[in-house]
Design a protein with these regions (language model features):
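Charge-rich, low-complexity N-terminal segments
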Residues: 1-55, 61-121
C-alpha cells in the first residue's frame, strides 16, 4: 500500500526497481565522481516512486552504517549530479527528482529481534 492507502501500481514498482539498479551501478562504479563521498560503499535498499513518477524516494545505507547521516546529506547536496548521471542510464521522458533518505529498516529489525530474544529468555 502506498501513501493514503492507495495500492502501488505495477508501473511504480517497475520504474522504482529500474532506478534502484541503475543507482546501484552508478555508486558501485563511482560514475558520478562525487567529491568527498565513498560511493562504492553505498547500498540502495529501496526506491519508492510517487504515483505521478515525478519523485523517487531513495533509501540508502552506507557500508557498515558509519557516517550515515553525513553520507545522506552529501547525496542530497549532489543529487543534481547523480540525477544527471542517471539520465544517461535510463531512457525516460521525465527523470524523477531524487530524494535520499537513510534506511533505518535494518536498525528497526535488529531492535525487534533483540526484544524477541529478551522475551524468550
Amino acid at each position: 500500500m502506498g501513501k493514503l492507502g492507495k495500492p502501488v501500481t505495477q508501473r511504480q514498482l517497475r520504474v522504482g526497481e529500474m532506478i534502484k539498479q541503475a543507482l546501484s551501478m552508478i555508486f558501485l562504479k563511482d560514475e558520478a565522481k562525487l567529491p568527498n563521498i565513498q560511493t562504492k560503499g553505498i547500498t540502495v535498499t529501496e526506491v519508492r516512486m510517487s504515483p505521478d513518477l515525478k519523485t523517487a524516494k531513495t533509501f540508502v545505507l552506507p557500508l557498515g552504517g558509519i557516517n550515515s547521516d553525513e553520507t545522506v546529506e552529501s547525496l542530497k547536496e549532489f543529487s543534481f549530479v547523480i540525477r544527471k548521471t542517471l539520465s544517461r542510464k535510463i531512457n525516460m521522458k521525465f527523470l524523477p527528482k531524487l530524494l535520499f533518505v537513510k534506511d533505518e529498516s535494518f536498525d528497526y529489525a535488529e531492535k525487534i529481534e533483540n526484544l524477541i530474544k529478551q522475551t524468550n529468555k
